[in-house]
Amino acid sequence: MVTRAGAGTAVAGAVVVALLSAALALYGPPLDAVLERAFSLRKAHSIKDMENTLQLVRNIIPPLSSTKHKGQDGRIGVVGGCQEYTGAPYFAAISALKVGADLSHVFCASAAAPVIKAYSPELIVHPVLDSPNAVHEVEKWLPRLHALVVGPGLGRDDALLRNVQGILEVSKARDIPVVIDADGLWLVAQQPALIHGYRKAVLTPNHVEFSRLYDAVLRGPMDSDDSHGSVLRLSQALGNVTVVQKGERDILSNGQQVLVCSQEGSSRRCGGQGDLLSGSLGVLVHWALLAGPQKTNGSSPLLVAAFGACSLTRQCNHQAFQKHGRSTTTSDMIAEVGAAFSKLFET
Ligand SMILES: *[C@@H]1O[C@H](CO)[C@@H](O)[C@H](O)[C@H]1NC(C)=O
Ligand SMILES: *[C@@H]1O[C@H](CO)[C@@H](O)[C@H](O)[C@H]1NC(C)=O
């Protein structure tokens, strides 16, 4: 307990110092005192919120135990991967394993399967997504899966998207949690009804994907000065589906609460970082729903899971950047998952 509080304070301190120096550099001496006070009050408050929410994430993590059998800590399915894109589904699926899932499946187009298998012997790869039976082929696995991550490396081929639509429908019918990213979000922007009101869905749009969804669902441009309000409104308009807007700070809402994750990352953004987020979120969503609302102190389990995945991704980015600087890539970030996880959640 003592070391946990210590680590939290150290991280919090670093954030305050970074923010204050940024403020001072920007505004110069006359505004110093005022800004400093305003900043430290506001930041101290949001850092306390962050630390409280991290504590809730720690509550949902299942203890490692020798009495459990394989598969109990999570069997995750990634739906994505086509001829053009094979990296994204690999990154999402391997991230799920590294975070603590026992098994990670990839349901991809047939051309992508040998490539993804060759990246890793640790994944189970099903070359079914472009088959006429795709929906049935995935559905028969659903009773054995705890969560689906839909979209990494999916592409926009009509036939594939039709199959994914069917997969989302059967997943909903079986109450399987779904994390939707990348071209999965493109599909949702075409047909918001697919996930409208589904409380076990989490959407993880970047800025472009967010604007497209906002446009499609609220039929008007968003107010770029009010990102909290925009995320809240999109979530509500989708029937309180959890939305995670990725950005300089990640903004999360379930239509009721808005959380901000500003865990220190780095200014390096590489393609693939979103796959680390969606893959780890698949596992955390399963753990959070398993733990239930008592463990999350009344907050939405999905929101707590999303906060955990955002913090973890940013911490991985931070650690990888310390070692590799500009040359940091997603593989370097994934190599940090173990250390980042224990720093945030097990210290
Ligand atoms: C749990 O909820 C109570 C009441 O809302 C709040 O006072 C407390 O700070 C929360 N604890 C954590 C760890 O978030
Ligand atoms: C979403 O949450 C808001 C705030 O609690 C509530 O007013 C609204 O009725 C909810 N919408 C749905 C569809 O449940």
Curated annotation (Swiss-Prot):
Cellular compartment(s): Mitochondrion
GO annotation (BP), single: nicotinamide nucleotide metabolic process
Domain of life, source organism: Eukaryota
Residues reported in the UniProt entry to bind ATP: 246-250, 265-274
Cofactor: Mg(2+)
Disease connection: Encephalopathy, progressive, early-onset, with brain edema and/or leukoencephalopathy, 2: An autosomal recessive severe neurometabolic disorder characterized by severe leukoencephalopathy usually associated with a trivial febrile illness. Affected infants tend to show normal early development followed by acute psychomotor regression with ataxia, hypotonia, respiratory insufficiency, and seizures. Disease course is rapidly progressive, leading to coma, global brain atrophy, and death in the first years of life.
Family statement: Belongs to the NnrD/CARKD family.
Miscellaneous notes: This protein may be expected to contain an N-terminal transit peptide but none has been predicted.
Function as written in the Swiss-Prot or TrEMBL entry: Catalyzes the dehydration of the S-form of NAD(P)HX at the expense of ATP, which is converted to ADP. Together with NAD(P)HX epimerase, which catalyzes the epimerization of the S- and R-forms, the enzyme allows the repair of both epimers of NAD(P)HX, a damaged form of NAD(P)H that is a result of enzymatic or heat-dependent hydration.
The protein, known as: ATP-dependent (S)-NAD(P)H-hydrate dehydratase
Species annotation: Homo sapiens (Human)
Organism phylogeny: Eukaryota, Metazoa, Chordata, Craniata, Vertebrata
Gene giving rise to this polypeptide: NAXD
